[in-house]
Structure formats: structure tokens, C-alpha cells
Amino acid sequence: MRNLGSKKSLFMKKIIQTSEAPAAIGPYSQAIESGNILFVSGQIPISPKEGKIVSTTIAEQTEQVFSNIEAILKSAGYSFQQVVKTTVFLTDMSHFATMNEVYKKYFTENCPARSTIAVKELPQGALVEIELIATK
């Protein structure tokens, strides 16, 4: 853990990293835990084993994103039931319904707050990226 402020600060952060999800492709962590809150960086559909985008379909890409997120959540001792906020980035809003079909497999009741944002493009040509916040 690292102190985020002065000596008087109570805010600490723990870097979460797992080989079960793709390594960060830039200067950021897979996730950061501060107190009882977990901040998961945006995940794109990179296979951690192959190191590349898994598919060209939105359904398969969304499944891979959730697989990556699940690995990060588990490595930090969290589950999908503890997610309180998600942000979904789509390169094409016509993919919204298909992404939603996959999304609702992971959030069946007591769904987290969510924003869905259309973006021009995502890293490595991904069609979807999802970031989230979970709490214990």
C-alpha cells in the first residue's frame, strides 16, 4: 500500500494485478483498492493468454471484457454483486442491445448504476470497453 497524501492522510491505495487479465497497455494499473473501494480500469477484449483482441463480434468482445473484469475482481477479493457503478464505452451505439444481452448475464438483480458512452474509437480497434467501481 502507498500513502496518497500527507502523513496525516488516511487514504491508502493497493495496486491490484493479476496474470488472469491482460496487462495494462499503458501507464496505469488493472485496478486500485483504496479502503473498501475497488476502482477497475477500463477493460478491452484482450485475451490475457494471446495478448490480442479476441474477436470482431460485439458479443464475444463483451464476454472477454467481463472475463477480464471477473479475474480482476476475484484477485482483489470482490465479486460482481459488489459492483456499484459501471461505465461502458461503445464505438457504435447499434451494438448497445447485443452488449446489453451479455451485460445482464453478470448483473441480474440489484444492478449497479451505469453510463454508456459512444466514443470514436478504442485502443487496438476494440468495440467495447468497460470500467467499474466495487465496494465491500
PLM feature segments, named:
Residues F11-K136:
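Short, polar/acidic, helix-capping and beta-turn segments at strand->helix junctions
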